[in-house]
Amino acid sequence: MTRALLVVDVQNEYFSGLLPITHPQGHLTNILRVMDAAAAQAIPRVVVQHTFPQPDKPFFQRGTPQWELHPEVRGRPHDLLIEKNLPGSFTGTALEAWLRQQRIDTVVIAGYMTHMCCDTTARQAVHRGFKVEFLSDATGTLPLNNSAGQVSAEELQRAILCAQQMLLSEVISTEAWCRRITQRTQARMRAALGQ
């Protein structure tokens, strides 16, 4: 299994803008933790940044402070930066070609929003033959209230995670994922040493 971590849309809009992420607690801390764990295990990190090209959209406008990556993400090393204009990170980007070139077979989903760009990107990955590990507490969402109804952030997060686990992704916590990648590296080292 050869992984790449996709850090989806961790932009200021979700912290100080119009779309504040409210659930789960610790979402940013967990995103940073998986970025650091991936770096320590030489797992490639792909940072995805959303841009709306339409000037009438009230958020994700290139060049605005809210469009910028969160400083903690921007300050960490990554292997590829992808800019996208639609919810799916594969649409209109070089992501798939880069993953194939790197011989990646598994993508790990972290970032925002669970119900929109993370969910869409995970589904696109499955349709392209990739395995998906969907980080349950390193993704995040917010409550919705629109003409179709309303749903709390907790309910929305739980529903998407349950749907992902059904036939699409392996839903896994940050703690379990970090332990998994560390154990696999240790096992490979022991095998190389003939232990």
Named regions from a protein language model:
Residues 13-16:
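Short acidic, Gly/Ser-rich segments with clustered Asp/Glu that frequently serve as metal-coordination loops
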Residues 7-8, 44-50, 135:
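Short beta-strand segments at enzyme active-site cores
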Residues 19-47:
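A short alpha/beta connector and helix-capping loop motif
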Residues 2-4, 30-41, 58-195:
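Active-site-adjacent betaalpha module
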